[in-house]
Each structure stands twice: as structure tokens, then as C-alpha cells.
Amino acid sequence: MNDTPHVKLHGFNNLTKSLSFNMYDICYTKTPKEREAYISYIDDVYNAERLTNILKHVADIIGAHVLNIAKQDYVPQGASVTMLVSEGPVVEVPQAEAPLPEAVVLSLDKSHITVHTYPEYHPSDGISTFRADIDVVTCGEISPLKALDYLIQSFEADIMIIDYRVRGFTRDIHGYKLFIDHDITSIQNYIPEDIREKYDMIDVNIYQENIFHTKCKLRQFDLDNYLFGHTKDALSKQEVEETTAKLKREMDEIFYGKNMPSGF
């Protein structure tokens, strides 16, 4: 996506690039038993071990070296993984009482990949949702956008909210500041066409601040894909209409970020 010729830099590339990927899975559970089964299913499918494997693959895609991994499954539900990464290969630092070199500390502090999961449900409406928040923060030439396609395909979300920003600056050999080192007009530039065709998308970008924001909502709606433990054949015509309305309203509220009146 970047045809800009390489600029010779003075020293290390100090740009910090942050990709925030929030995905939502929505489901209708008819009974409390189905709801508990859905949450248990989500907890099993997106446990800390599987999330760790996803993040390891993200690190491979962006060319980062894993320094440390911390992971945890929570009770009653949810999981999180934090991975520290570096742009260069891992170098063994000799044991010494003196503080570590500053460059090593910066490498550890500023490049990381995290994921947290949040299953939840409506107290009485039958709607259950699952949210996963993934943050990929890199310092240097590594671009987290390279992993976006893989993340989208890993979660197959009903709704995605994606943010990307670039902070700091680096200098060329003449001292001229560079506040971004690649071409981008929209996060959609980095989403393959076959995926873009599946989603309705809205962009809110602030170009002068290097802030890019894209919301995505699945276009095709098949009720059977949102029912857990049964199919629409088990529902009456009225139940199909009411359940469809509930699910679409839930998706619209998440997509637009606001509560909506019944019948919207």
C-alpha cells in the first residue's frame, strides 16, 4: 500500500503506531440455559491459549520478536493476553547491577500487543454479546496495519470498530521532522476488497492529526447465524419478526454508539 520511496533517517524511527481493533459477536439465546451455554462456548473458543496463538501470528505478520507473554483466563468469564515485542531480534543482556540501557527499556515499553475479551448479556431480552479488544502498538518501522486482514478473518465479527493513529516524529538526515512514514487515507486501504464487500463501513478521519477511524457492520443478515441452541424453524412467525428486530436494533446501537427507541 506504500509506494513512497524510502527516506534516509537520522537515528532510530521514533514513530509510534497504534491499531485498536474492537470486534463484536451478537447472539440470541432464548432461555437462561442457552445463555449460559453460549457464554461457556465463547469462553472455550476464545480462551487465553487460543488468543495467545492469534497474537503470536500477529507478531509474525508484522515482523516483531516476542519478548514476553502474560495470559490469564478469568472466572466467571473472559480472558486477556499481553505480549511485549520488539522490532529487532532478541538480544541476551548480560547480568549487571547497573541499569539496563535506555534503548532496551524503550523497546520493551513502547511495542506491545494485547487482547481482552468481554462476554455479556441483556438481563431480560435474550440478547448476548461478546466483545474482543485487540491493541497493537509498535515503535519503529513495524506497521500494525499489516495484521488487520488476519485479525478480521480470525474473529469473523458482526461489527468491527477500528482505530489507527500515528504519534511522535522522526527525522531525516537533514533534521527535517517526519510525523508519518507511510501513505494512508483510510483504514479501508488496508482491508481486502472481498472483506469490504461484506460490510457497511463509515469513516471518521482527522488527517492533520494522523487519526483514522472506521466502523464496519455485516451487510447480510441470516437469523439462523444469530440463534444459539436452536434454529428459526423452532420459532413462530411472530417470534422470528420480534427476534430479528431485537438483533438488528442491538447491532445498530453498537454500530452507531447510542441507544435507540424500540421499533427503530
From Swiss-Prot:
Binds 1 pyruvoyl group covalently per subunit. Keywords: Autocatalytic cleavage, Decarboxylase, Lyase, Polyamine biosynthesis, Pyruvate, S-adenosyl-L-methionine, Schiff base, Spermidine biosynthesis, Zymogen. It catalyses: S-adenosyl-L-methionine + H(+) = S-adenosyl 3-(methylsulfanyl)propylamine + CO2. GO terms for biological process: spermidine biosynthetic process. Its cofactor is pyruvate. GO terms for molecular function: adenosylmethionine decarboxylase activity. The keyword Secreted does not apply. The record marks 110-111 as: Cleavage (non-hydrolytic). It holds the Pfam family AdoMet_dc. Belongs to the prokaryotic AdoMetDC family. Type 2 subfamily. This is S-adenosylmethionine decarboxylase proenzyme. It comes from Geobacillus thermodenitrificans (strain NG80-2). The lineage of its organism: Bacteria, Bacillati, Bacillota, Bacilli, Bacillales.
